[in-house]
Amino acid sequence: MTKYKGLLLLGILLFTFSCSKSSSDSEDVNATTQVDKSGNLLATGDSAFDILSNDNFDKLLIEIAYVSGFRPTESAMTQFTDYLKQHTFKEDIELVYNELSSPSEDELTLQEIADLETSNRTVFNTGSTLAIYIYFADAPAEGDDLDGGLVTLGSVYRNTSMIIHEVTVRELASLSASINESDVETTTLNHEFGHLFGLVDLGTEMVNDHQSQSENEDGQLVGDNHCNQEGCLMRAELQFGGSSGKSLSSNALAKYEAGITSG
């Protein structure tokens, strides 16, 4: 409110000396302070066409927001960028890193993840640039059961928003000498971005029916936006390190893929 009054007073003074200059300056102030975030607050899969084509956006600007000490490996980011160039046909892909303090949470709910994005995200769609936000967290997802083999490595919850639970990624990688952090990071990033591509049945039409099913809250079998084919990147359960590795089932089923569209 204080800032608004200051701008109003400034506008009155400028109007006294020059009407045309006051109008122009006011428009400039509004243009620099207003950011249109609406294109980044849609449902998961709503930007699949824009990600997979160059019709509306020919550049990807990806914000890598990470808690101090939980920055992803350079190897994973290189492989991830190569994966995006291969599947999006966008050659102009820029990564910007944003180091953040820890939210000091034992676990993160979907709403808490969205609230953190609201506070920390700095990149949004502009012109022909499509902006993506990826948060590397120092806290596991709500409801993880590492001993029981059920954890969430990553989740998508809006059309351009993703979280990687880096603390869980590292814990998984430490369980076997046959896998490393880069392997788990790369697989998780590629899997979750597959959902932003609209997979499975999240905005991109299936050529062949390959969606797996799981029980919903009512005990009914419904499509869970994952793949039912062996060896598919979009399976809900990802296998690392072969027979000597650790297999954990993803907890990022329909409740995450449906996500939230505002906030």
Locate the predicted segments by residue:
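The catalytic-center signature of Zn2+-dependent metalloproteases
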Residues: 176-257
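Short, P/G- and charge-enriched loop/turn segments at secondary-structure junctions
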Residues: 117-123, 149-152, 220-221
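Pan-zinc metallopeptidase signature
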Residues: 261-263
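C-terminal motif of bacterial Sec signal peptides marking the signal peptidase cleavage site
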Residues: 15-18
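Propeptide-to-catalytic entry region of secreted or membrane-anchored zinc metalloproteases
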Residues: 20-132, 136-142
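Bacterial N-terminal signal peptides that target proteins for export
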Residues: 1-8
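Short glycine/proline-enriched loop/turn "hinge" motifs that connect secondary-structure elements
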Residues: 52-56, 154-156, 225
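Active-site-proximal segment of zinc-dependent metalloprotease catalytic domains
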Residues: 126-205
